[in-house]
Structure formats: C-alpha cells, structure tokens
Regions:
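N-terminal alpha-helical targeting/anchoring segments
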Residues: 10-14, 18-33, 37-213
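TRNA-recognition modules of translation machinery and tRNA-sensing kinases, especially anticodon-binding
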Residues: 97-100, 113-117, 206-543
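Methionine residue identity
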Residues: 1-2, 9
Length: 543
C-alpha cells in the first residue's frame, strides 16, 4: 500500500515538473515575423508549433494587411505617343481626357526644370553648412565670439535656401503625383482590330442564317417573352422579389432554378475541358481593386455603376469594400502585388459567382425581365499571358487566350441551339480597360418588330457574352509582374477575360427560342438534360 502511494506521489511530482517546464518554455516564445503573427489569428496552433509544422511555401501565402497595390502607368510610352493617346481618348468617347497626354508632357518638362532649379540651392546649402561647421569649431576652440554675427547670417541664408528647396521639392512632388493621376485616368490604347466610332463590325453567325431564319422571325409576337413564358410555367417569380427586395431582382423557382444550375455546371464543364481551372471567388472586394481593374463607381455620364458597402464607425479607417460586378475583379486580384514565374504562364481560370450591378439609367421594353437585373450568377473566364511578342519559343500570347475564350463561348452557345451573331465592338463600347472586345448576341423573339411589311431584326439582338483583351492595363494597376521565362527582365503580363455564361440572359433566351407554343412547353437543350434529371421539356408546374 505504501509502495503504491509513493509511486503516485512520484508520478504527481513528475507531472508538476513537466508542467513547470512547459510554462517556462512557453514564456520564452521565439521571434515570429509579422506575417505569421497575422496568420496565427486564424490558426488555433500556437506560434512555435505552427512554425515547426509549416512549410516555407505556405508561409508565403499568409494573410497580409490590406494595402492598395502600387500602380505603374507606362508614362514613357504615353510621352512618346502623346498624339496617339489623345486620338484614342476622342475615339473612345473620353473627350475630357484628350488633353491629358499633352498635360503629362508639360508636367514632366516642368519637373525636369525643377530638378535643375534644385541643384544650385542644394549645392549652396552644402557650402554654407560646411562654413557654419568650420566657424562653430573655431569659436569652440578659441573662445572667439567675433564670428557670431557671421554665423547668424550664414544660418539665416541656409534657412532661406532650405525653404526655397522645400518649396521646389513640394512642387516637383505635386507634378509627379499629377502625372500619375492623369496617366492612370487614360483608357487603354485600342487594338488595330477595333472599329473606330459607334458601329460594331459583324464577324459572323452561330445557329443562324439571315437567308433562312427561324419560322418565328416571320411572325413577330411580343407576347412570346421569357417573362410571360417563365411566369406561366412557374419558373420565374417577380412578384415576390418586388416584396422582398424591389425592382431588378427575381426568384427562379422549380425547373427555373434547376435550369440555372444546369447552365452553371455545363459552362464550367466546357471550360475545364479547354484547360481552364475552376475557382470559387468572393463577391465582395476592396474598392481600389475594382478601380484598378477599370471599373469606376460612376461612368463618364456620372451614372452609378458599383455598389459600395457602408462601414461601421469602428471600420472607417479600413479600406472601402464594394460588391463585385463580375468575377473578373476578384480573379484579376488573385495575383495583385505578386510576381508570376514566366514558366507558369499562361494561367487560365474559370469562376462562377454572384454579380451585382447598379445598372442606373432608363429601363425599356428590351431590358425588362431577366435581361437587366441588379443581382445574377455569371461564369467568368480570366487569364494571364506573357506580354512578350511571339517568337521561336512559341510564347502563348493574349491573342491566343482570346481565341480560346471565343471558342469556348461559341461551343456553349452552339450546343444550346441559340441563334447568335458575333460582333467586333467599336471604340466607344470598350470601356477603360479593354484594348479589343468581341460580343456575342442572341436573337430574342420577343424583341422582333414588324413595320411596312418588314421585320426589324436589329432590335431583336441582345448581348449574352463578351470577351476582352486588356493588354497590361490591369496588371500595371494591380502590381502583377512576370519574372523569368523567355526573358530575364521583369514585365507586366497581359490579361484577358470573357463570359462563359451570363445565366439570366441565356436562361431567358432558352425560354423564348425553345418555347413550343402548340404544346405550351419549353424544350430543354440536350446538353443540359443530364443536369436536369433527364428532363426533355419543361411543362407547367401544377403545384
């Protein structure tokens, strides 16, 4: 019995000793870098333990404080091609920006003059300070106060020179800041492929022959709208959304909700087959990220484009956040402030997300229903390519990725049996970031108009996809660089983006073009049926 008690006592002493050792070790916490401390807030493990089991590659991905990436506009190129940038502003309907290139040249010239103006006072300040130091040493060594008056004069002169130098330096800094502001405000240069003006160029058709159009084209029926069809079949509910949220929102119900998910999964599947990697991005971003991608809170007509999120008083010091209008914004920012190894290019991502648009402005018959809404699901394609010119190394360029985008869009819309046309968009329709853009529009039967014995096809087309080449516009503003690969010097990659699936618009087009008036059903495109339980037609929901 005594032996057991002694053993228990020894065990307790051992436990106490181990616990004391643990406390002493814990009090001597080793140095942990700031990044690891920040990431530790989300990690239940203590710093020493986490560092012991964390690879160096993971530590490179730790959470960093939110700071806007430093933009690097190509000021040298703007100065060397000022006339081209001025014309580009006019062509792209940015008349107020047309004087910016010349103003940038003037400010840079002024900055150079100021640099020259600084040389004399800085040199004189150095001389005066050396003289002051020499006189001060003499006074200290010899106890001579006769030079005090001279010292006072020299110090006054030095102060005057410093004040003048400070004023010149301040003005030079102002010039530099203004040059950057003006340069970042300029729209991207347009591609030679982009038509100048307001009219797009017709590239071709998908599932449509103008000489032999579908039968419904010859008998326009405004009642054949996706709103009427979707409501009668129990697929769309605008009444409830008007109660819950207001104009511009909707409920997709029954097979309508299934059709939405089928479109998402099908488009993701096609993109993956083409080598694009799936990503699920956030729908809230820092406002400076949206701006760096070329999305302004208001357009050139001062109409609201982006919703910002109101911050509480305790968060006022934090960066403003906004609702993303497209997954293009968070996807582009995945490499903000980072270097991409040249060997990793091209990078091709596809992401489905909820998108939010303020969509300010008038609302007409051609934008009713699902066509223009405030919140919707969209599958977006985004890619980075090297900015080097194609050569013997077979570098994948932005033109290559752009062609890949278009082939994915064409495959999806062709398989959905939607009548489409492909347009090369004009300069006035490019926005700020795009150098080149192609849209694909679907023929909406409800938009057909007849008059004087003819049917107006032009009014029936509605955009469902868009693809853009942004060259280095976004990467310069997001601080994304390429290092290594086919060249030693660092450079800014090109970015491309495009719509794989704008769900509500394509869903609306399927309802209108796939509607069988005689049977009162909508034919489900064969490629979507596997995601809808084999359903071939959508009939009226009896419940």
């Amino acid at each position: 019995m005594m032996t057991n008690q002694k053993a228990d006592m020894n065990f307790s002493i051992l436990q106490l000793s181990l616990f004391t050792t643990f406390l002493m070790a814990s009090s001597r916490t080793p140095y942990v870098c700031l990044n690891c401390r920040l990431s530790n807030k989300l990690n239940p493990l203590s710093s020493p333990i986490r560092r012991r089991f964390t690879s160096s590659s993971y530590r490179q991905q730790v959470i960093r404080p939110a700071t806007a990436p430093k933009p690097t506009p190509n000021i040298k190129h703007i100065c060397q091609n000022a006339d081209a940038y001025t014309k580009n502003c006019i062509d792209r309907n940015y008349p107020s920006h047309a004087e910016y290139p010349l103003r940038i040249q003037q400010l840079l010239e002024e900055s150079r003059r100021l640099d020259q103006d600084l040389k004399t006072p800085r040199s004189r300040i150095k001389q005066v300070e050396q003289t002051i130091a020499k006189l001060a040493r003499q006074n200290a060594q010899q106890g001579d106060t006769n030079s005090d008056e001279e010292l006072a004069r020299l110090r006054a002169e030095a102060q005057q020179l410093k004040d003048k130098s400070h004023a010149v330096t301040t003005r030079k800094s102002t010039c530099t800041d203004e040059v950057h502001r003006l340069a970042l405000s300029l729209p991207n240069l347009s591609s030679p492929e982009t038509p100048v003006g307001h009219d797009p160029k017709l590239i071709g058709y998908i599932n449509f022959d103008p000489q032999s159009p579908p039968e419904y084209v010859s008998r326009p029926d405004p009642a054949r709208s996706h709103v009427a069809i979707g409501t009668s079949l129990g697929l769309i509910d605008f009444t409830s959304s008007a109660t819950t949220t207001g104009w511009g929102w909707y409920f997709l119900t029954n097979e309508g909700a299934l059709l939405e998910q089928a479109l998402i999964q099908y488009s993701l599947n096609v993109a993956r087959r083409h080598g694009w990697k799936p990503v699920s991005p956030p729908s809230i971003v820092y406002s400076y990220i949206a701006e760096a991608c070329g999305f302004q809170p208001r357009d050139q007509h001062n109409e609201q484009q982006i919703w910002t999120i109101e911050q509480s008083e305790k968060d006022k010091s934090k960066p403003q956040r906004s609702l993303a209008g497209t997954a293009e914004i968070p996807l582009a920012a995945m490499y903000a402030g980072r270097d991409i190894p040249g060997s990793d290019l091209p990078i091709k991502l596809v992401g489905a997300s909820r998108c939010y648009r303020a969509e300010a402005g008038s609302r007409g018959v051609d934008t009713k229903g699902l066509y223009r809404v405030h919140e919707f699901t969209k599958v977006e394609l985004f890619g980075w390519s090297d900015s080097l010119s194609p050569d013997a190394t077979s570098t994948v360029t932005s033109d290559t990725l752009f062609a890949d985008l278009l082939s994915i869009q064409s495959e999806i819309l062709t398989s959905l049996n939607l009548p489409c046309r492909i347009l090369e968009m004009p300069t006035t329709d490019l926005g700020a970031s795009a150098s080149r853009k192609q849209d694909i529009e679907v023929l909406f039967p409800s938009r057909l108009r007849s008059g004087s014995g003819n049917v107006d096809l032009e009014s029936a087309w509605g955009e469902v996809t868009s693809s853009s080449i942004c060259t280095d516009y976004q990467s310069r503003r997001l601080g994304t660089r390429v290092r290594g690969g086919a060249a030693k010097e660092s450079r800014f990659p090109h970015t491309v983006n495009g719509t794989a699936m704008a769900v509500p618009r394509v869903l609306a087009a399927i309802l209108e073009t796939g509607y069988d008036a005689e049977r009162g059903v909508v034919v489900v495109p064969p490629v979507l049926r596997s995601w809808m339980g084999g359903m071939e037609v959508i009939v009226e929901n009896e419940s």
